[in-house]
Each structure stands twice: as structure tokens, then as C-alpha cells.
């Protein structure tokens, strides 16, 4: 009887370990911030300002884009067969109401998280899904970037529903690549964060916390 009980407990333990599989992407520390790759958008007047803060849930990243555009990127391998879901906690304090985000003149978002798959020798050949916190579009709206067909904007949150409050969202990246790019991606090559207002010439303020991939 003791052997049976032990086997049951062991099976439950294995199940809980499997269900808890996670891969943390950003720690949001000062040291990490200094090491992340900063990419200024070509033609932007200034860089987005990124700073580290802390609340009851741990460290977070604050982004202030005032007629500015630059992103923070990390090259990291993510096994999408193992952990296909991206989880993001974020907040928009100042949004970009009134712009047309799916046009070249209005292609700005208060908060974005890119997931990137290398598909060629140069960055221009990469495929990306740009998960965005929109100020004007609806959740689950998606469209190819007006600047490149290889990046698709996908709305996970909108200030029409959640403004100036923390919200946590989840997306199945593996399935989204199949749906949006017609690609069966087994491994990602990088993740990036950006807040940008270089097209609208406006100001946006956003926050990021607890960005990780999970098995479910």
C-alpha cells in the first residue's frame, strides 16, 4: 500500500513540475538594462527613455517615448515546442488616442513586445510578431506592419479596455506564427521591447513586468 501511495505522490509531483515549466526573459535589473541591445529606429529624433522601478510584484521597466523610438532587445533561444506561451504584464499610463496605428504616419504603440525568428542572413529577413498594447484598435486585431511585410502587429491589449492599470496577457506564439506567417517555428531567436512615438510626434508612457514563456 505504501508503494502505491508513493507512486501516486511521485506522479502528482511530476505533473506539477511539468505544468510549472517557465522561461523568464527579462529580470529588469539595472545591470540587465545596461547590457540589453538598444536599437534606435532610423529617422527618429530621439531614443525612448527606459528606467527600472519596483513595486509589490518585483522589478519593472518604465518606458517614456516623447517623439522618440528605440527598443531593447535580447538574443535568446526559446523552445516553442516546450514553452509556446508568452506571458506579459504591462500598463499604459499615457496612450496615443486618435492616431491610426496601422498606417505609416500613425504606426506608433505605447507598448510593444516583439518575438523574433531569424529566417535569413540579415535582420531585414527576420520574421516577427509584434504584440502590442494599442490605444485605438481592438483586442485580436492584426495587420502587417506598413513598413515591412515580415512583421505583423497583433493587439493583445487596448487602453479602450484597460488604461493606467496593470494587466497580464498570454499568447500562443507557436500557433500565432502558423496563423500569421504560415511558419511552423520550433525555436525563437530573440525578444524585444519598444515604446515609440516617432511618427505621431506624441508622448507615451508604459510599464513592463514579468515577461516569460510557459508550457501552458
Tell what function each PLM region has:
Residues 20-43:
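Extracellular carbohydrate-recognition regions
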Amino acid at each position: 500500500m505504501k508503494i502505491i501511495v508513493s507512486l501516486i505522490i511521485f506522479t502528482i509531483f511530476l505533473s506539477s513540475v511539468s505544468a510549472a515549466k517557465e522561461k523568464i526573459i527579462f529580470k529588469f535589473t539595472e545591470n540587465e538594462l545596461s547590457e540589453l541591445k538598444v536599437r534606435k529606429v532610423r529617422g527618429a529624433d530621439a531614443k525612448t527613455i527606459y528606467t527600472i522601478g519596483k513595486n509589490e510584484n518585483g522589478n519593472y521597466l518604465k518606458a517614456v517615448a516623447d517623439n522618440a523610438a528605440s527598443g531593447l532587445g535580447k538574443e535568446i533561444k526559446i523552445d516553442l515546442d516546450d514553452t509556446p506561451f508568452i506571458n506579459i504584464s504591462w500598463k499604459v499610463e499615457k496612450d496615443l488616442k486618435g492616431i491610426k496605428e496601422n498606417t505609416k504616419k500613425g504606426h506608433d504603440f505605447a507598448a510593444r513586445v516583439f518575438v523574433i525568428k531569424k529566417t535569413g542572413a540579415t535582420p531585414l529577413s527576420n520574421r516577427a510578431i509584434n504584440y502590442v498594447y494599442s490605444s485605438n484598435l481592438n483586442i485580436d486585431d492584426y495587420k502587417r506592419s506598413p513598413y515591412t511585410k515580415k512583421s505583423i502587429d497583433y493587439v493583445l491589449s487596448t487602453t479602450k479596455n484597460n488604461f493606467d492599470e496593470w494587466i497580464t496577457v498570454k499568447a500562443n506564439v507557436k500557433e500565432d506564427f502558423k496563423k500569421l506567417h504560415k511558419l511552423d517555428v520550433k525555436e525563437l531567436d530573440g525578444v524585444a521591447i519598444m515604446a515609440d512615438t516617432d511618427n505621431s510626434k506624441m508622448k507615451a508612457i508604459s510599464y513592463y513586468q514579468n515577461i516569460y514563456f510557459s508550457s501552458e
